[in-house]
UniProtKB/Swiss-Prot annotation:
Main location: cytoplasm
PROSITE patterns documented for this protein: NAD_G3PDH (PS00957)
Organism: Streptococcus pneumoniae (strain CGSP14)
Protein name, as recorded: Glycerol-3-phosphate dehydrogenase [NAD(P)+]
HAMAP family xrefs: NAD_Glyc3P_dehydrog (MF_00394)
Keyword Acetylation: no
GO biological process, one term: carbohydrate metabolic process
Entry keyword annotation includes NADP: yes
EC annotation from Swiss-Prot or TrEMBL: 1.1.1.94
Length: 338
């Protein structure tokens, strides 16, 4: 692939790791953020120590606070900002951009109040004459591993296969490989909803439960994620792929996962306020839990694990009581759809 110029919006852990992948592939990378100290650190010291204490970035990766300068003559834009500000940043991009580009996003969540997928938000806020079909970049991927060039395989999903293939070629190299998919709803909901199950899996660990319980929450969590996704129009097959079960495994079993760590702390009795303050990073699973719970209620989708986590986070239900309620639900067949 010829050299491309890519704007990466969001200098967090995943945005930084993906910037390095793009730079390794010979592309010009511009990171945009709104914290001058962080941007100066990236440009001066080639580090982003809030996320990666021992990683030195290539000096060709340049960071900006000026959005217009960041977007000038770019071929593609990658959104990697928190879910709650995606719409705001998309509005800023629409007001600044003066030519058509490929639009990608690698964030995982649902808009808290509208319950909308992030690709829908980008479609609503960025006019068609300025963008391609949206491409979702998602899958089992810890930034801490990608940044040290550990093997990573994820998915590029777009309604337009050719656009997904462009992104596949843009990112893929000897340690980072993308597969394409046209099921945007499936890939996007899988990436968002697995964060909820990861919070639950972490809570089980914090409470001292063993591998049996952790395997159960992942398997049954996947079942209810699939039910909601299919109700929204996704293919059930997507949830057996990298962006589905793959991402659920990596997020629901690893200390690298901030959602798993948040759940672990909840299980050990820490308050949500203390957890968020101590982590200093966005825990997407918290806001996504409310959005998914409300969406499931609206669509009539059975999601007992999500409901239990919602009750714990937003209504102060004791975690052990929530587990007891799940274990005493009416008996069902494993493949029962409701």
């Amino acid at each position: 692939m010829e050299k491309q110029t890519v704007a990466v919006l969001g200098p967090g852990s995943w945005g930084t790791a993906l910037s390095q992948v793009l730079n390794d592939n010979g592309h010009e990378v511009r990171i945009w953020g709104n914290l001058p100290e962080q941007i100066n650190e990236i440009n001066t010291h080639h580090t982003n120590k809030h996320y990666f204490k021992d990683v030195v970035l290539d000096e060709n990766i340049i960071a900006y606070t000026d959005l217009a300068e960041t977007l000038k003559d770019v071929d593609a834009i990658l959104f990697v900002v928190p879910t709650k500000v995606t719409r705001l940043v998309a509005q800023q991009v629409a007001q600044t951009l003066d030519h058509k580009v490929i639009i990608m996003h690698a964030s995982k969540g649902l808009e808290p109040d509208s319950h909308k997928q992030l690709s829908t938000i980008l479609e609503e806020e960025i006019p068609e004459h300025l963008r391609s079909d949206i491409v979702v970049v998602s899958g089992p991927s810890h930034a801490e591993e990608t940044i040290v060039r550990d093997l990573t395989l994820i998915t590029a999903a777009s309604k337009d296969l050719q656009t997904a293939q462009y992104v596949q070629k843009l990112f893929s190299n000897h340690y980072f490989r993308l597969y394409t998919n046209t099921d945007v709803i499936g890939v996007e909901t899988a990436g968002a909803l697995k964060n909820i199950i990861a919070v639950g899996a972490g809570a089980l660990h914090g409470l001292g439960f063993g591998d049996n319980a952790k395997a159960a929450i992942i398997a049954r969590g996947l079942a209810e994620i699939t039910r909601l996704g299919v109700a929204l129009g996704a293919s059930p097959l997507t949830y057996s792929g990298l962006s589905g079960v793959g991402d659920l495994i990596v997020t629901g079993t690893s200390i690298h996962s901030r959602n798993w760590r948040a759940g672990d702390a909840l299980g050990r009795g820490e308050s949500l306020a203390d957890i968020e303050a101590n982590m200093g990073m966005v825990i997407e699973g918290i806001s996504t839990t409310r959005a998914a719970y409300e969406l499931a209620q609206e669509l009539g989708v059975y999601m007992p694990i999500t409901q239990a986590i919602y009750q714990v986070i937003y209504h102060g239900t004791n975690i052990k009581d929530a587990i007891y309620d799940i274990m005493n639900n009416e008996f069902k067949a494993e493949n029962e759809w409701s």
